[in-house]
Amino acid sequence: VEVDEPDVSPLQVQGPKSAELMANVFGDWVHDLGFYRFKEFNHEGIPIVIARMGYSRELCYEIFLQDHSKGDELWECLWQAGQDLNISAGGPNIILRLEGGILSYLSDLDRTNNPYEVGLDWMIDLDQEDDFIGKEALREINIKGPLKKLMGAEIEADPIYESNEDHLPVLIDGKVVGSMNAMV
């Protein structure tokens, strides 16, 4: 057995000026790229895939560089093209993810959750003819309701400047009744 890992490096370009920056560098076609759609091509000798997706409520493109040795070249190309737009480098922003209602696997949910618990019940079609694993269990949860539910809460306390690494227990009279999964 030989394991072959793809040489792919992701870079996100997001924010209100992301479409303008991407069009300046790659062409106006990026405006027509649908959400969760992608295009694979070669830009000035740099093999890339551009996808219209994102992990915040902001307009976002993900660039998948298919040759790590071209990373600096791609970064400089984007950076120079964005100077007139007053762009800046950033990192993951949990606030935007939470405000946008975007779930993160292991932060907000895991394999023990069902769609009713995490607000994804709109994706379930129990009336379809086709059978699928868990259909009867989901039908029962649909009738009885979920035992727990992911929800937001606002707590008046001192500000939290870092997101929590672990789920923190929620207690009532010393009994664990839930957990705080992602906080900002």
Feature map (PLM): residue ranges:
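Conserved, structured C-terminal
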Residues: V1-V184
